[in-house]
Amino acid sequence: MAHHHDCECGHDHHHEHEHESNSVQIDRYHEAFNKFESALPDTQTTEAVNALLEKHFQENFTPEVLKTIHGCIDLTSLTSLDTKENIWKMVDTVNDFEGTRPDVPNVAAICVYPLFVETVKQALTAQEVKIASVAGGFPSSQTFTEVKIAETAMAVMQGADEIDVVMNLGYFMEDNFEELTEELQEIKESCRHAHLKVILETGALVTTENIQKASILAMYSGADFIKTSTGKGYPGATFEAAYTMCKAIKTYHSITGNKVGIKISGGVRTAEDAVRYYTIVKEILGDEWLNKDLF
């Protein structure tokens, strides 16, 4: 049994040690943030996006680009009213599309709640279409880490190729980066072979500075993709958010050599908007990102 020597200097050494280790941890994150150029202030980001789109949008608004975008879509159903029958019908539309337009690729994935992964797996006959499942207490992410890990592992076991989880924004807002990143790393481990998409919920983060920080934390925690939004309860994707995320991905790639994908979700209603996002990704990250493995 260890004998504790009580010091009489009046300081709580254990407490001081905790402070020290906390400040070392915080320094570690700031060190990572400092490797990235500061995000442009919000108004300047808007100006940069507008200039980029004015210059390049028209050249990308072509049938070829729209076909490429079609092949990068995650066809999604995430409602409280989802049933096996509805999900099966959705999968049938993907199966039926297969081979009807040789010049248009099928969607990249079908995204559902964990409960329906098995249904998609049974129904899906289309080749090379992946099964994506949300997990981790989607969409608020406010549950126990153990539950998130179990839900992720079960979805993968049922047949999910991709897992979409929301970053814990509560941890983010209180600068609790240690728990935030540890949790994401544990979820990543429970994905095994499946890809991890980390949703930042950019509409809740609001500022470009927050969006950049969240992108950096997600990437260093093992995200294969960073994704804008859940489409639930907060504003969806914006051009400014996509621009900021792309800039962070580019710097991360130059530092580590790792390519992280970007998924735009929530509020993309028109072909024009889809092409605008495509244009932002193309101009910042280049053509090598314009495929379903990274976009």
Tell me what each language-model feature is.
Residues 110-112:
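Short, hydrophobic beta-strand segments that form beta-sheet elements in well-ordered domains
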